[in-house]
């Protein structure tokens, strides 16, 4: 499926649900407390991020959509911090304030990119407070195209059926990020987005694709829901509707670093895309790409439009693979690193591509997720190899290399050595063929200094460009 991003700035979205504050206390730890067998963390940084439904709204705003956020908060410092955080990014708050209840806060203590403990500050809200919030939210229905119900089972959304009916009657799509085993509460919704665990909590265990589709179709019929998007971790997503074949979308995530807020990212990308005019399959593909980006980040995070553009160009081959310029490659590498991919780089003239080259490049690619081949341009080959070389011009050499399954990117360089371009791109692993010493490999010191590594691979015995040329000349 070719995926195109809509004009997100045209999207008008209302998010209703359980808002919370994600608070991070971060610092180094180097000793154990004398009071108990626990680490001592010396806090050096405190950061507040909008979480729950607030993170959904923040994701919509980061993509460029117009968004309002309705939620329940206490009259406390956490509510003030949450308000400041969302307003700074263009989200309009519509709070229902409750006396004597705290704003839901999740405090995480972090050290060395690891979460040591989480402390939750929350109390359940009475059902009357949920009714008051939904009544407050009805006033915004005339000005939006999509409503998101972000349910974390904290009491903000207890019985939303009447609200859903009013929204649908006004032509507003209602998307639900569900919680719990009672999907009857979301009767009449346009779309629900359970993960696989939430889906199986409702329908029982699922052992095959066919069973997943069958049970999803039954839910659609039972609760008058238009569509279900089941998020399935490493298996991607599956969209089931009543009037079309199921759509399986494979994951684009290469490495999962932190799943905090991933579900928020999915539904916010769906809502923004649909509100901006995308059809449902397109919106699901955009949401899948956004999820692949966010799980490679630490903590509750958002995804920007530019990140989506770069990810889609790389994942769908519109640009970013094959023969590229240095600047194009720099953008592609930035996205690859967001996905947690290990990048390998090698270089050479590759004047007459032979079996030894193919074997060597295959070995190099197997050491990581992506392989860059930097190629000497024609002038540098002539300086290094002498008159009569190269046999093949650089554009032809690059085209042949780019056609190999093992090669992701081919980039030219003009100098006699690739030191400058390696120093700019800084791969995770620099590979060189032959009998080099690691300390003599151009760019090796820079790669190691940046935290990468250098490796020497052997070539096939008796196979070289020089010997091939000599054999050709001898047989003329």
UniProtKB/Swiss-Prot annotation:
Record: residues binding ATP: 195-198
Region: Ribokinase, residue numbers: 1-319
Keyword field contains Transcription: no
Pfam family, one: CTP_transf_like
Coiled coil: none
GO cellular component: cytosol
Catalytic reaction list: D-glycero-beta-D-manno-heptose 7-phosphate + ATP = D-glycero-beta-D-manno-heptose 1,7-bisphosphate + ADP + H(+); D-glycero-beta-D-manno-heptose 1-phosphate + ATP + H(+) = ADP-D-glycero-beta-D-manno-heptose + diphosphate
Keywords from the UniProt entry: ATP-binding, Carbohydrate metabolism, Kinase, Multifunctional enzyme, Nucleotide-binding, Nucleotidyltransferase, Transferase
NCBIfam families: cyt_tran_rel, PRK11316.1, rfaE_dom_I, rfaE_dom_II
HAMAP family in alphabetical order: HldE (MF_01603)
Protein name: Bifunctional protein HldE
Organism for this UniProt entry: Shewanella sediminis (strain HAW-EB3)
């Amino acid at each position: 499926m070719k995926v195109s991003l809509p004009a997100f700035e045209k999207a008008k979205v209302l998010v209703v649900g359980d808002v919370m504050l994600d608070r991070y206390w971060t610092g180094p730890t180097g000793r154990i407390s004398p009071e108990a067998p626990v680490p001592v963390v010396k806090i050096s940084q405190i950061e507040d991020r909008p979480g729950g439904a607030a993170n959904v709204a923040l994701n919509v705003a980061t993509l460029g959509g117009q968004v309002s956020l309705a939620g329940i908060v206490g009259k406390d410092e956490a509510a003030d911090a949450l308000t400041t955080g969302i307003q700074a990014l263009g989200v309009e708050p519509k709070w229902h304030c409750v006396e004597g209840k705290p704003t839901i806060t999740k405090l995480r203590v972090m050290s060395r990119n690891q979460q040591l403990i989480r402390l939750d500050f929350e109390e359940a809200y009475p059902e009357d407070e949920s009714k008051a919030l939904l009544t407050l939210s009805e006033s915004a229905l005339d000005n939006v195209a999509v409503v998101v119900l972000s349910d974390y089972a904290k009491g903000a959304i207890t019985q939303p059926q009447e609200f859903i009916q009013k929204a649908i009657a006004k032509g507003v799509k209602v998307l639900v990020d569900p919680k719990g085993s009672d999907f009857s509460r979301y009767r009449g919704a346009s779309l629900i987005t359970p993960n696989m665990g939430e889906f199986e909590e409702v329908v029982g265990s699922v052992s095959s694709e066919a069973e997943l589709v069958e049970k999803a179709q039954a839910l659609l019929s039972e609760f008058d829901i238009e569509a279900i998007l089941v998020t399935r971790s490493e298996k991607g997503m599956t969209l089931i509707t009543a009037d079309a074949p199921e759509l399986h979308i494979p994951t684009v995530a290469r490495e999962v670093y932190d799943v905090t807020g991933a579900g928020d990212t999915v539904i916010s990308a769906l809502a923004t895309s649909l509100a901006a005019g995308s059809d449902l399959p397109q919106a699901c593909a955009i949401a899948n790409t956004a999820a692949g980006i966010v799980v490679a980040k630490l903590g509750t995070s958002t995804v920007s439009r530019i990140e989506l553009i770069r990810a889609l160009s790389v994942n769908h081959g519109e640009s970013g693979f094959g023969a590229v310029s240095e600047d194009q490659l720099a953008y592609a590498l930035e996205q690859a690193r967001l996905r947690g991919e290990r990048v390998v780089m090698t270089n050479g003239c590759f004047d007459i591509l032979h079996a030894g080259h193919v074997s060597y490049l295959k070995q190099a690619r197997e050491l990581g997720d992506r392989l860059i081949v930097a190629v000497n341009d024609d002038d540098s080959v002539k300086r290094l190899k002498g008159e009569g070389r190269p046999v093949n011009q650089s554009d032809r050499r690059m085209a042949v290399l780019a056609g190999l399954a093992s090669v992701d990117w081919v980039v030219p360089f003009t100098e006699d050595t690739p030191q400058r371009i390696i120093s700019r791109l800084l791969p995770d692993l620099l590979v060189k063929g032959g009998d080099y010493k690691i300390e003599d490999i151009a760019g090796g010191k820079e790669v190691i200094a940046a935290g990468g590594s250098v490796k020497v691979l052997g070539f096939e015995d008796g196979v070289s460009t020089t010997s091939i040329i000599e054999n050709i000349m001898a047989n003329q």
